[in-house]
Swiss-Prot record:
Catalysed reactions, semicolon-separated: RNA(n) + a ribonucleoside 5'-triphosphate = RNA(n+1) + diphosphate
Xref: InterPro entries: DNA-dir_RpoC_beta_prime, DNA-dir_RpoC_beta_prime_bact, RNA_pol_asu, RNA_pol_N, RNA_pol_Rpb1_1, RNA_pol_Rpb1_3, RNA_pol_Rpb1_3_sf, RNA_pol_Rpb1_4
Residues engaged in binding Zn(2+) 2: C814, C888, C895, C898
Cofactor notes: Binds 1 Mg(2+) ion per subunit. Binds 2 Zn(2+) ions per subunit.
Organism domain of life: Bacteria
Record-listed E.C. numbers: 2.7.7.6
Binding site for Mg(2+): D461, D463, D465
Native species: Alkalilimnicola ehrlichii (strain ATCC BAA-1101 / DSM 17681 / MLHE-1)
Cofactor(s) required for function per UniProt: Mg(2+); Zn(2+)
Name of the protein this chain belongs to: DNA-directed RNA polymerase subunit beta'
One term of GO molecular function: DNA-directed RNA polymerase activity
Record has Nucleotidyltransferase as a keyword: yes
Binding site for Zn(2+) 1: C71, C73, C86, C89
Region entry Disordered, spans: 1392-1426
Length: 1426
């Protein structure tokens, strides 16, 4: 282990290769060994001569000469005296740069505690001595004595004594005991610790105790003591006798004009320490009174504290201008600290920035670079060329020529620039496509020209955005820029694998316009021999683009074997489409362009082109598309006029109808038929429906034109400009058009509740004052949110990158057979994501069989590409097990098989790809689009009308899942289960639709029935929740006390009365007396407090005996929650499936459970929800035990008769019934599931599925596509740590959090030695926690809480193996990813076997090299096939 600071002792000794960095505590000897002399005086420099003072903070004798090779007094100058020490001034003659690396030291007159180990919680000193922080501070700051050696006295070691107590003890015991105060006392205590003995006793204590909290406390201390023992640090080093002094050039003193000086704050802080130290020395020599010395020692301690970490204890020391001084700790932490400012965020030479303008004539790989800018950026290349040509003799002459900008200079510039890519970057760089390489084209002017198609990737527009240009200098850098970063090599988005180079806005509009059919177009019905003729006809004005014509086209398509087949045939199509097909490359069929080219269709076209024709063809095609789109949209002349916003004529009638309905509801409310909450819900519902209806009418009117064709009226798709913009996907959406020409609809208040009076006007008609005022709420909130959102999104990305930065593909295959189970995602009647989309680009984990047979369709280990997926779809496969990063067994990193396809390249992922960072960027980049709370479009409330039935969309057969039904006397079935679902299967037995069936829904079909499309299979009342009886009998009320547990409400209009259950909280304090039969059959009076009464309905037979639920011996008792409304009378007869009571549902905040970004952050931080769902801890049968005061007791009886109890608060909705069977991990009380519970009860894959689903839901709502595997990669990083359950014979402690890789390595070693390995369970850490808990302390320290991380790492003597990317960037090495991965592998191999490495370098290892190249080919084979 080399000592970093002593490396600089030998002149010119640079740090050679190193593979790890260790951090530890510095012993006083080590600090003295770094030092070149003691700093004795607080002076800095002499203000008259500007020479450093001798023995001061800038002393040249200690730190080295101020000028190169010149001593301070000027006796020795120049290089020939190098290494001489001047006898007059004592300065060594050497370069001045040593003042950046030579350290000094200060010998402290009294020891001082290091504040980090004292105050950084948990206090390390306190933990070692087993004392509280408060006590130790009292000792250190001279408020109390501590007993160090009790001798024969009754005092105890480590006991604190106040002044009086100390004097008393002295009186009593004289000098039999020893007590001290200050850091010396703590130093003595630490020195006298017997670490090994302590560790032994602690281990025994832990074995012998059962209390959790005690174990936690003891193991904390044990861990620290063992860390000290292992690392070779000594506890007494946490108290310092000698203080290192930073080299002077790192804390400079700079003269300003006017004779003043700017100084680094550190100089002030050091000066304070030196002053106090010198004063203390003098006082000790004079043997001053104790109290004065004590005070001075305390001040010394405080000044050292301030130097190390100002403001950590007490008030921060401030400078002249009331601003706290920047201490050593502040230098490294925070955004402005060393890590984030200088090590991770360096500024780059050879770069410039300018405004961007559009470059529609560029090709995809080009950018326009202003001449002046290029001249400046490529200067070194121009100089060398000028010298090479002999046009300039020296660099100076070359410089002159360039400044004069002579003709030859421009010629040489254009030569230098040829084929030399430059990199363009637009801040904020949210994902890797924010920096791309282009070939520069010299242009006049001062703005950079950017190709329009890369705007999406950069998220750039031309409203004044600026971009930076960087020049890759070395040949390797140019090569990488060209091969990896060129815009033409980044066609697909790394987030979703879809093309990102797709036309948008005017290009889309142009292509859409040219491919739209016009029924009344000029030249319809003409016939052409080829596309050239169509061109001529169009240019001569005989033919409109939208005319349907017949034309002969040449179509070239690939056959099965990959050969190209040409066929020429006649098609009937729109003229514009024939013209468009001309630029489509060979290999794509005509049907791809024979449709209206909306943005989606164009994206599909580019995608198909990339998959079938390859990269080069796609690049050329994309450019052609753009040129054509621009020219066509110019020709189309689409513009917006007020008349384009057509308000539908039916609007008035629709509104009038809605007003009527609302009036009805208001009347019902007035007559007491509905509660206020129900009224509000229904009104909001009506207006939501109305808004939909108006929008529908408007779109119908806008989307259709009537034209006269050959004397008759025909209907066609509209050519309304606004409609075309929205329909083509160029700009705008149906929701925006709705506000322009429909009605604005319901608005939301800032708190998210919906204002029940909607804005019936639209922007075309104009808003009145009230309407405008209502709509300002949402609009303002929207703007405020946007500002907060951007910052939050950036922070989320930072946390994600930090947790996943060290995840790299490190091997080809880890050999696991595990994986995730994939099925299509179906919500309601829609297949939201097909199986094909989910498994595309994944590797199959186990053989896939054709449903119902044992024929293997895809073998394990197949990488599924587009063709494979299509094949699987045709075979009717509806579930596949695929490999996933979550289940990957690779220790460090992931393997290529588990990751699957590299989404941005379309083939298997290469070893060395930094998949972690890609995942983090893919999730973080769309973060800015995610709203904080989802109010779209100027605050218009987006709340779907509540659903009250299930209407099937496809015909097929119905399957019911966990639906328990009872047959109603009307012949229908009523659902009496809570988590039931109904699915519709097609003829192949594949699931097409899936719906939730709520409790109390009336089903009109049974399991296995055939249904037609459009049929309603279930319906229910969305605003109330019924309680259904499962048996027939008489109603008997129990615990119904009018005025106490129930209140009778009489409707004034109808005169009908109903009972409403009151809330137990509002019942008052009385007691209720009731008669009960005791064990001997006697009637006894029982007193029950009002609060404990539980109103319920019992069902009894004719004789009044309790009835049981069919098939069980559980009595039919139905408990009634607060607010339940009962409209039956006591003794009424009920039939199976009747409703006994109904509970009104009041819900109408904007349907938006923490939407958007905060939801994503909550999931990744693995936060516990406020009211988590309660999950069943074991499988078994549910029963209810005796209730406690505020909780109900739920008992689960396992199959073997063991019982498990769970106390559930009474206000929680329990979703299971007595006698129901639950599986481990099933929900028993509603709520948001807690991810930690899912992991504990259901395992890693269930957790992954949950997180992926929840996060995808948020992104899907915003229409953002992200591949599942990115979320899985982050999940893998959150599951890095495991909790040790039983340490076995390992050195881990019970409950310790350890990296999974470390436990597995330790277990391998234990198993090899035939010892019992440790058992562990996976732990889920949030991304911030996981980043701070990483094995690499450098990475953690540069993320957050720098002080805490470094303190902890130093006491452990932590070693950083520089595995991740971040650590390597910080120490300035190549990162172990991409091209750096191979470099590091090579180095590792060379170290492991230096002789073989040397041989292979010379070329002696003849047998070896062909082998490696062969395996290389073998490794890349599958990707070529795919």
């Amino acid at each position: 282990m080399k000592d970093l600071l002593n490396l600089f002792k030998q002149p010119g000794a640079q740090l050679e290769d190193f593979d790890a960095i260790r951090i530890g505590l510095a012993s006083p000897e080590m600090i003295r060994s770094w030092s070149y002399g003691e700093v004795k005086k607080p002076e800095t420099i002499n203000y008259r001569t500007f020479k450093p003072e001798r023995d001061g903070l800038f002393c040249a004798k200690i730190f080295g000469p101020v000028k190169d090779y010149e001593c301070l007094c000027g006796k020795y100058k120049r290089l020939k005296h190098r290494g001489v020490v001047c006898e007059k001034c004592g300065v060594e003659v050497t370069i001045a740069k040593v003042r950046r690396e030579r350290m000094g030291h200060i010998d402290l007159a009294s020891p001082v505690a290091h504040i980090w180990f004292l105050k950084s919680l948990p206090s390390r000193i306190g933990l070692l001595l087993d004392m509280t922080l408060r006590d130790i501070e009292r000792i250190l700051y001279f408020e109390a004595f501590v007993v160090i050696e009790p001798g024969m006295t009754p005092l105890e070691r480590g006991q604190l004594l106040s002044d009086e107590a100390y004097l008393d003890a002295i009186e009593q015991h004289g000098d039999e005991f020893e007590a001290k105060m200050g850091a010396e006392a703590v130093l003595d205590l630490l020195k006298s610790l017997d670490m090994t003995g302590e560790a032994r006793t602690l281990r025994e204590e832990i074995e012998g105790t059962n209390s959790e909290s005690k174990i936690k406390r003891l193991s904390k201390r044990l861990k620290l003591i063992e860390a000290f023992l292992e690392s070779g640090n000594k506890p007494e080093w946490m108290i310092m006798d000698v203080l290192p002094v930073l080299p002077p050039d790192l804390r400079p003193l700079v003269p300003l004009d006017g004779g003043r000086f700017a100084t680094s704050d550190l100089n002030d802080l050091y000066r304070r320490v030196i002053n106090r130290n010198n004063r203390l020395k003098r006082l000790l020599e004079l043997s001053a009174p104790d109290i004065i010395v004590r005070n001075e020692k305390r001040m010394l301690q405080e000044s050292v504290d301030a130097l190390l970490d100002n403001g950590r204890r007490g008030r921060a020391i401030t400078g002249t201008n009331k601003r706290p001084l920047k201490s050593l700790a502040d230098m490294i932490k925070g955004k402005q600290g060393r890590f984030r400012q200088n090590l991770l965020g360096k500024r780059v030479d050879y770069s410039g920035r300018s405004v961007i303008v559009v470059g529609p004539t560029l090709r995809l790989h080009q950018c326009g670079l202003p001449k002046r800018m290029a001249l400046e950026l490529f200067k070194p290349f121009i100089f060398s060329k000028l010298q090479l040509r002999g046009l300039a003799t020296t660099i100076k002459a070359a410089k002159k020529m360039v400044e004069r900008e002579t003709g030859e200079v421009w010629d040489i510039l254009s030569e230098v620039i040829r084929e030399h890519p430059v990199m363009l970057n637009r801040a904020p760089t949210l994902h890797r496509l924010g920096i791309q390489a282009f070939e520069p084209v010299l242009i006049e002017g001062k703005a950079i020209q950017l190709h329009p198609l890369v705007c999406t990737a950069f998220n750039a527009d031309f409203d004044g955005d600026q971009m930076a240009v960087h020049v890759p200098l070395s040949l390797e850098a140019q090569l990488e820029a060209r091969a990896l970063m060129m815009s033409t090599n980044n066609i697909l988005s790394p987030a979703s694998g879809e093309p990102i180079i797709v036309p948008s806005q005017d290009v889309v509009l142009g292509l859409y316009y040219m491919t739209r059919e016009r029924l009344d177009a000029k030249g319809r019905g003409m016939v052409f021999t080829d596309v050239q003729e169509v061109h001529r006809a169009h240019q001569n004005g005989v033919l409109d683009l939208g005319a349907r014509v017949q034309v002969r086209i040449r179509e070239a398509v690939f056959d099965e074997n990959g050969g190209m087949n040409e066929r020429v045939h006649r098609v009937e199509t729109v003229a514009g489409r024939a013209l468009l097909y001309e630029i489509v490359p060979d290999g794509l069929p005509f049907e791809l362009v024979d449709r209206d080219m909306t943005k989606k269709a164009i994206s599909g076209l580019v995608n198909a082109c990339y998959r079938r024709v390859g990269l080069k063809g796609t690049v050329v095609f994309a450019d052609q598309l753009m040129y054509m789109g621009f020219s066509m949209s110019t020709g189309a002349g689409v513009s917006i006029g007020v008349n384009d916003m057509e308000v539908p004529a039916e609007k008035e009638k629709i509104l009038a109808d809605a007003e009527e309905e609302v009036k009805d509801i208001e009347e019902q409310y007035a007559s007491g038929l509905v509660t206020n909450g129900e009224r509000y819900n229904k009104v909001v519902d009506i207006w939501s429906h109305t808004n939909e209806a108006v929008a529908k009418a408007m779109m119908e009117k806008m989307g259709k034109d009537l034209v006269e064709v050959d004397g008759e009226q025909k209907e066609q798709k509209s050519f309304n400009s606004i409609f075309m913009m929205a329909d083509s996907g160029a700009r705008g959406s149906a929701a925006q058009i709705r506000q322009l020409a429909g009605m604005r609809g319901l608005m939301a208040k800032p708190d998210g509740s919906i204002i029940e009076t909607p804005i019936t006007a639209n922007f075309r008609e104009g808003l009145n004052v009230l309407q405008y005022f209502i709509s300002t709420h949402g609009a303002r909130k929207g703007l405020a949110d946007t500002a907060l959102k951007t910052a939050n999104s950036g922070y989320l990305t930072r946390r994600l990158v930090d947790v996943s930065q060290d995840l790299v593909v490190t091997e080809e295959d880890c050999g696991t057979t595990e994986g995730l189970h994939m099925t299509p995602i179906i919500e309601g009647g829609d297949v939201v994501e097909t199986l094909a989309d989910r498994v595309l680009g994944r590797v199959v984990a186990e053989d896939v069989y054709k449903p119902g047979t044992d024929e293997v369709v895809a073998a394990a280990g197949t990488l599924l590409d587009e063709e494979w997926v299509e094949h699987l779809e045709q075979q009717g496969v509806d579930e596949i097990r695929v490999r996933s990063p979550i289940t990957c067994q690779t220790r460090h990193g992931v393997c290529a098989q588990c990751y699957g396809r590299d989404l941005a390249r379309g083939h298997g992922v290469n070893v060395g790809e930094a998949v972690g960072v890609i995942a983090a960027q893919s999730i973080g980049e769309p973060g800015t689009q995610l709203t904080m709370r989802t109010f779209h479009i100027g605050g218009a409330a987006s709340r779907a009308a509540s659903i009250n039935n299930v209407q099937v969309r496809n015909s097929g057969s119905v399957r019911l899942h966990n639906v328990k039904v009872v047959k109603h006397h009307s012949g229908n079935y009523v659902a009496v289960s809570r988590s039931g679902e109904v699915t519709v299967m097609d003829d192949h037995g594949r699931e097409r639709e899936r719906y939730k069936i709520p409790y109390g829904a009336v089903l009109s079909v049974a399991d296995g029935d055939a249904v037609e499309s459009g049929q309603i299979v279930a319906n229910w009342d969305p605003h109330t929740h019924p309680i259904i009886t499962e048996v027939e009998g008489r109603v008997r009320f129990y615990d119904f006390v009018e005025g106490v547990t129930v209140a009778r409400e009489v409707d004034e209009v109808t005169g009908l009365s109903s009972l409403v259950v009151t809330d137990p909280k509002s019942r008052g304090n009385g007691e209720h007396r009731r008669m009960v039969t005791d064990a001997s059959g006697k009637q006894v009076e029982e007193r029950v407090a009002y609060k404990d009464l539980r109103p319920m309905i019992k069902l009894v037979d004719e004789d009044g005996n309790d009835l049981n639920i069919a098939g069980t011996d559980i009595p039919a008792h139905y408990f009634l929650p607060a607010e339940a409304i009962i409209s039956l009378e006591d003794g009424a007869e009920v039939r199976v499936g009747d409703a006994l009571a109904r509970i009104p549902q009041e819900s109408s905040k904007t349907r938006d459970i923490t939407g958007g970004l905060p939801r994503v952050a909550d999931l990744f931080e693995a936060r516990k929800p406020k009211e988590p769902a309660i999950l069943a801890e074991v499988s078994g049968t549910v029963g209810f035990g005796k209730d406690t005061k505020g909780k109900q007791r739920l008992v689960i009886t396992k199959a073997d008769g063991e019982t498990y109890e769970e106390l559930i608060p009474k206000w929680r909705t329990v979703t299971v019934f007595e006698g129901e069977h639950v599986e481990k991990g099933e929900v028993i009380a509603d709520g948001e599931p807690n991810p930690h519970d899912i992991l504990r009860l259901l395992g890693v894959t269930a957790l992954a599925a949950y997180v992926v689903k929840e996060i995808q839901d948020v992104y899907r709502l915003q229409g953002v596509k992200i591949n599942d595997k990115h979320i899985e990669v982050i999940c893998r990083q959150m599951l890095r740590k495991v909790g040790v359950k039983d340490p076995g014979e390992s050195h881990f402690l019970r409950g310790e959090q350890v990296d999974r890789a470390r436990v597995l390595e330790a277990n391998d070693a234990l198993e090899a030695a035939d010892k019992t390995p440790a058992t562990f369970e996976p732990l889920l850490l949030g991304i911030t926690k996981a980043s701070l808990a990483t094995e690499s302390f450098i990475s953690a320290a540069s993320f957050q809480e720098t002080t805490r991380v470094l303190t902890e790492a130093a006491t452990r003597g932590a070693r950083d193996d520089l595995r991740g990317l971040k650590e390597n960037v910080i120490v300035g090495r190549l990162i172990p990813a991409g091209t750096g991965f191979a470099y590091h592998e090579e180095r590792r191999r060379a170290q492991a076997d230096p002789i073989a490495a040397a041989e292979s370098a010379i070329g002696l290892g003849g047998g070896e090299q062909p082998a490696t190249s062969e395996t290389g080919a073998g490794g890349s084979d599958p990707s070529e096939e795919g």
